[in-house]
Amino acid sequence: MPGKQFPLKEYIAALAKFLDTIEYQDDNFSHEQRVESLRYVYQHTAKHFDQPIEKAAVTVSPKRLQAVMRTSTLVTVYCWVKCPLDVMVGVSIYFAYIIMLDDSSDTPTTEMKTFCEDLIKGRPQKHLFWQRMNAHLTNFLRYYDGFCAITIFRSTLDFFQGCWIEQNNFGGFPGSSYFPHFLRRLNGLGGISSATLFPRSEFDEGTVFEEIVTAIAQIEPQLTLCNDLISFYKEYDSPRDQINLVSNLAHCNGVSWEIAFEELTRDTILYCEQLVTVFKGKDPKVEATVRAFVHGYVTWHLCDPRFRMQEVYEQAGQSEADLKFRHFYEQATSIGVIDFKLWASPSRLSSDKRKHEQAFGDDPQNGKTRVLESIGQANASEAVALAPLA
């Protein structure tokens, strides 16, 4: 909505109510645990993309790849708190591929003509994304039982189609009231983000099947709505971000952006309330996993500079809602803002890797039970968006 004054008062009130609803308090890690987890996941993500076959396939610049890996590492460590480290690495690699797909601008019509036939007959895919993603999923899905694995693959297909639609810069026809939600569900990655929380090493899918299915159902809308609410400030006056849920709701339903924003706020709080209450009295490990994910997801948003939350914080006044938002923001940044040099500095990579090998050898179980003394390869300053969190 370029040219119009941003509704700061209403926006801060919505954020404060949202954060209050989920009772935001990220106690997932100590500072040392967070830094060490970032080091481990980043270093192993970088190791994956340093393989010759990946180097040949990646089309982005080295600087861009470093930024992509930093982002995938951050969101994974902050949100997949209860997962073993080897699972975190798999999630981080997955999101790196997703970010690079989201960066692309070429419509995949030609390469996708035989996608279904190739998939059914087990032939190699023609699209580069699917070649590399399928190779990764072949290993990554081994961490999961059947229902979660299918959900992860289905969510990947959905995201690809969502990108395909957005590459055509299409936000829906007027009168197509469900289209904005349809598109947001496709590109929201809610399925992958929820199903990957439940690896078979931590959960028996058969025992907590109902809880897992409910988590997938509830996290899908909550994930995207939370992102859309927090992103509203940065997208408000950005010409390149005008194809978003609020603008699509206004366009398709023939209403003002104010009404569309009210709908976004109402739905965000509704689904957050449900997510907070629905697991009470259910399996405690599932409840703790979902809670850790939701609170870590908020921390990542509040601390990532690209969402410009510091600007909102600096403009906040002294009303009850403003003070509440300021409190939550200060709480998040006190734990979530960490200098990249502490975990993604190239100067420390070799020495830390040697320390890790001397301390733990190559036993993979150590990687699941203790954060290893290792660190990433890059400290690029380039910002990057993660599609479902953009």
Swiss-Prot record:
SUPFAM superfamilies: Terpenoid synthases. GO terms for biological process: sesquiterpenoid biosynthetic process. It holds the Pfam family TRI5. A motif (WxxxxxRY motif) lies at residues 316-323. Some of the cofactor binding sites show unusual localization within the protein. Pathway: Secondary metabolite biosynthesis; terpenoid biosynthesis. Mg(2+) 2 binds at N227, S231, E235. Its EC number is 4.2.3.-. The keyword Magnesium applies. It catalyses: (2E,6E)-farnesyl diphosphate = (1R,4R,5S)-acoradiene + diphosphate. Terpene cyclase; part of the gene cluster that mediates the biosynthesis of flavunoidine, an alkaloidal terpenoid with a tetracyclic cage-like core connected to dimethylcadaverine via a C-N bond and acylated with 5,5-dimethyl-L-pipecolate. The tetracyclic core is synthesized by the terpene cyclase flvE and the cytochrome P450 monooxygenase flvD. This is Terpene cyclase flvE. It comes from Aspergillus flavus (strain ATCC 200026 / FGSC A1120 / IAM 13836 / NRRL 3357 / JCM 12722 / SRRC 167). The lineage of its organism: Eukaryota, Fungi, Dikarya, Ascomycota, Pezizomycotina.
